[in-house]
A protein has these predicted regions:
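Helix-coil boundary and interhelical linker segments in multi-pass alpha-helical membrane proteins
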Residues: 687-696, 760-772
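Alpha-helix capping/termination and helix-coil
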Residues: 370, 602, 655, 659, ...
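Membrane-water interface at loop-to-transmembrane-helix junctions
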Residues: 731-750, 770-775
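Conserved cytosolic headpiece of P-type ATPases
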Residues: 1-726, 736-737, 750, 777, ...
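Generic alpha-helical transmembrane segments
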Residues: 707, 752, 774-788
Length: 873
């Protein structure tokens, strides 16, 4: 069966069992039984409780839960309580950040306009839009939202803004004509789509689809079927948790074997190994990552980027491809006059001379032959026409004043058959008809031309020159209008027969121009190793022209259309995408396929957009970025991040923030693991030497709550470096636990463990196990506090300004040092913390052992840096 747009209006009415006077009540009832209500199906909502429990799915969190259970069974209630508190805080933070993540379908429902004007059995009635059924005849005029999909059956110069659905920046001229060939959504000019707006004219349409069967409904279906992907950080932390578990199990097995070999009871050896394994897991890691990302969201909100899904903060830092919508994202979403062509010369809009009679005449005529208004910044009318009156405003010529001076006395409205509009005015004591329209059509009706020497007969050479200029404008992606005029006898009623013997005045070329900052932002992306790609519903020539201006496209061969994608298999598209920078005339399904093709090539994809048509791809992308000012609610709700200034450059800043945050999270992980490894080594050395265990359970509890958490969080807010934008994006499958990273953790943990063991032996030989345990506890706590400064950078920082540039780390150090000093020196606390009270000399010894780890590790960093530079040479 033919598509609806391929059938005549009469055939469509017959197909939906309707007539021009509308449906009867009985027909409405039958149609509703068959097609349902005109509303979007609502997906099953997750409760806050479900979202809360989903936070416990991470592998590392599951290990922590198991650790808490085992600790409780072994009688270590303090450790079990700490673990439970930490993972509960993490779950609460995660729930707060994600509780609004599933609102896309609610926003889509808002697009089903609240009311509609309908013919029911020949009578015009106003109804809630949800009551529309297939076969209803709807009445439309300028300003109306279209309540359902339909086929036009009556047209009076109807123009519709479909930009939110198709990406087309210009209002679409609607036509009654039947379209014989297959056509993409944006080219179905005899169809009307739910959620679009009428900008001009009047019309009637018969409803052909309602609810989930409309084009907006299909997008709702795509949103439901599009799965959300893990961000690189989520994948990395899962991988990290699994690898860490394996390492800890191996270590526990070795320790258990050693203990049994030394003659200890199997049960005692097992409990000791498990208790140590629980201590080895960085319980605070998940919470610290969540807190650091939350701080990142606050910083980015100040820089015009609101994060709706927490993991997107880091995910942006690993983006390798940005698929950007054109209209309203890279461009201003506002038609603007770019050039004039008059008397054989091209003049830019910035260089118009209003003192020149011809240029002023063209400016005035473009305001007079125009139905749009701009009052107090509120634009009403066709975007092309508002661009013309806005140009006048730039030069201090207000439309109201010109129209009052030369009042309109007649008009012939625009229609798609004539491709022109005419208005009649009293100018210089003459009746003058101004005609604007398509260049080709008006040249056919022109027999004279205005020049600086006066009006003369137009020649073929003149027409060829005008056509060449028109083609030049078109190749630059500009929309061109021709302006002509002629004198009309007084008291004459205008007819279309008057539209001939015209005087050619000039051309006006306009476009939706790029944002001023787009070019610099694209260049910054390319420098950072990120591939910018334009995906739009607009025409190929227009899209390519914009892309070339801002540096996305270099040759027209890098541009293609949705029809090209339609004929490709997924495998073919996957091989095709690296060669294409601009995709034009694409559907929502095409956008998802393009994003998925890049993802299958191992890329981390960000998709930006503002329209309804962008929502499914925003959700499919690794990071969806919506425009906050011009964006639809649908796009915002489907996205992970919303830009409050609609500025493409904000994305670049977000990428920089994301890369720095990932680096800071690595510093925090390095700090936690190297400190834990140092503690494990101290316990292992003591065990192998037949000495008492250096730490009491309360010591590990104190370390977990204080010397772990505060410095790790402070490292997470380490001041950012712009140098990260000189690097290529990291690989999507790059693990946090690289060999180099594990090597650094092992080496730094060895130093901390060594100094802790020296402290333990010093105290043990002075006055037995309790003093040794006190020395070990104090040395480990303080060494970890000093170690926070080691983890600020991969390079030595001890003699640089960077050593002191993190006030939060300094605060964490001072607070931690004061608390551990109080615990070690105040007599009343020794029983609670299972320590001996230290005198000043003993405390100084503990501080000295702890501080020694700082210069040793800084020296190791310096040696490693020199060796790396030598290898590079």
């Amino acid at each position: 069966m033919k598509e609806i747009y391929q059938q005549t209006a009469e055939e469509v009415l017959e197909r939906v069992k309707s007539r021009e006077s509308g449906l009867t009540d009985e027909q409405v009832r039958r149609s509703r039984e068959k097609c349902g209500w005109n509303e979007l199906a609502e997906g099953k909502k997750k409760s806050i409780l479900q979202i809360f429990f989903e936070q416990y799915k991470d592998f590392l969190v599951l290990i922590l839960i198991a650790s808490a259970v085992i600790s409780g069974m072994l009688g270590d209630v303090e450790s079990a309580a700490v673990i439970v508190i930490v993972i509960t805080i993490n779950a609460i933070l995660g729930t707060v950040q994600t509780v609004k993540a599933e609102q896309s379908l609610q926003s889509l429902k808002k697009l089903s306009g609240p009311e509609a004007k309908v013919l029911r059995d020949g009578v015009a009635v106003q109804l809630p839009a949800r009551e529309l059924v297939v076969g209803d005849v709807i009445l439309l005029e300028a300003g109306d939202m279209i309540p359902a999909d339909g086929r036009l059956i009556e047209n009076a110069s109807l123009k519709v803004d479909e930009s939110a659905l198709t990406g087309e920046s210009l209002a679409v001229e609607k036509s009654m004509d039947t379209i014989l060939e297959e056509a993409p959504l944006g080219d179905r000019t005899n169809m009307l789509f739910s959620g679009s707006f009428v900008t001009y004219g009047r019309g009637r349409a018969v409803v052909t689809n309602v609810g989930m069967q409309t084009e907006v409904g299909k997008i709702a279906g795509l949103l439901k079927s599009t799965s959300e992907k893990q961000t690189p950080l989520q994948a990395n932390l899962d991988d990290f948790g699994k690898k860490l578990s394996i390492l800890i199990l191996i270590f526990c097995g070795i320790l258990f074997a050693i203990s049994v070999f030394r003659g200890e009871k199997i049960s005692s050896a097992f409990m000791f190994a498990v208790a140590l394994a629980v201590a080895a897991i960085p319980e605070a890691l998940s919470s610290i990552v969540t807190i650091v990302l939350s701080f990142g969201t606050q910083k980015m909100a100040k820089e015009h980027a609101i994060i709706r899904k927490l993991q997107a903060v880091e995910g942006l830092g690993s983006v390798s491809v940005i698929c950007s919508d054109k209209t309203g994202t890279l461009t201003q979403n506002k038609m603007t006059v770019e050039d004039y062509y008059i008397d054989g010369k091209r003049i830019t809009a910035d260089a118009i001379d209003v003192a020149d009679p011809a240029q002023r005449c063209l400016l005035d005529y473009s305001i007079l032959c125009n139905d749009s208004t701009n009052e107090n910044g509120v634009e009403i009318g066709d975007p092309t026409e508002t661009a013309l009156i806005n140009l006048g405003s730039r030069y201090g010529i207000e439309a109201a004043g010109v129209r009052k001076l030369y009042q309109r006395e007649g008009e012939l409205p625009f229609d798609s058959d004539r491709k022109m509009m005419s208005t009649l005015h009293r100018i210089d004591d003459e009746n003058r008809m101004i005609v604007k329209g398509a260049v080709d059509r008006l040249l056919e009706l022109t027999d004279r031309i205005w020049t600086k020497d006066g009006v003369r007969e137009i020649t073929e050479a003149d027409k060829e020159k005008i056509q060449r200029q028109n083609q030049e404008f078109s190749m630059e992606g500009l929309r061109v209008l021709a302006f002509t005029y002629r004198e009309i006898p007084e008291k004459h009623v205008l007819t279309t027969e008057d539209e001939n013997h015209l005087v050619f005045l000039g051309l006006i070329a306009m476009m939706d121009p790029p944002r001023e900052e787009s070019k610099a932002a694209v260049a910054e992306c390319i420098k950072a190793g990120i591939r910018p790609v334009m995906i739009t519903g607009d025409h190929k020539i227009t899209a390519a022209a914009i892309a070339k201006r801002i540096g996305i496209l270099h040759d027209l061969s890098e541009a293609c259309e949705g029809a090209d994608i339609e004929n490709m298999s997924d495998e073919q598209l996957r091989e095709f995408v690296p060669n294409i920078s601009v995709y034009a005339r694409v559907s929502p399904e095409h956008k998802i396929r393009i994003v998925r093709a890049w993802q299958e090539k191992g890329m981390i994809v960000a998709m930006t957009g503002d329209g309804v048509n962008d929502a499914p791809a925003l959700k499919q992308a690794d990071i969806g970025v919506a425009m906050g000012v011009t964006g639809t609610e649908v796009a915002k709700d489907a996205a992970a991040m919303v830009l409050t200034d609609d500025n493409f450059a904000t994305i670049v800043k977000a990428v920089e923030n994301g890369r720095n945050l990932y680096q800071n999270i690595k510093y925090a992980i390095q700090f936690l693991l190297s400190g834990n490894f140092g503690a494990i080594l101290a316990v292992l050395c003591a065990s192998l030497a037949g000495l008492p265990v250096p730490f009491a359970p309360v010591h590990l509890l104190f370390i977990n709550l204080l010397t772990d958490s505060l410095p790790a969080i402070a490292l997470g807010v380490e001041p950012h470096s712009s140098e990260v934008m000189n690097e290529k994006p990291r690989s999507a499958d790059e693990s946090i636990l690289t060999k180099d990273f594990l090597g650094k953790i092992g080496l730094e943990g060895l130093v901390i463990g060594m100094m802790t063991m020296i402290g333990f032996l010093t105290g043990y030989h002075q006055n037995g196990a309790l003093l040794g345990s006190t020395y070990a506890f104090g040395t480990l706590c303080l060494a970890r506090l000093f170690h926070g400064f080691n983890c600020k950078s991969d390079h030595p920082v001890i003699f640089t300004k960077r050593f002191f540039n993190n006030k939060w780390l300094q605060g964490a150090f001072v607070l931690g040092a004061v608390l551990i000093t109080v615990v070690l020196t105040v007599p009343g606390l020794h029983l609670l913390f299972k320590v001996e009270t230290l005198d000043l000399m003993q405390l100084g010894c503990v501080y000295l052992y702890a501080f020694a780890s700082l210069p040793i590790i800084q020296l190791l960093k310096w040696i490693r840096m020199k060796l790396k530079k030598r290898e590079e040479k």
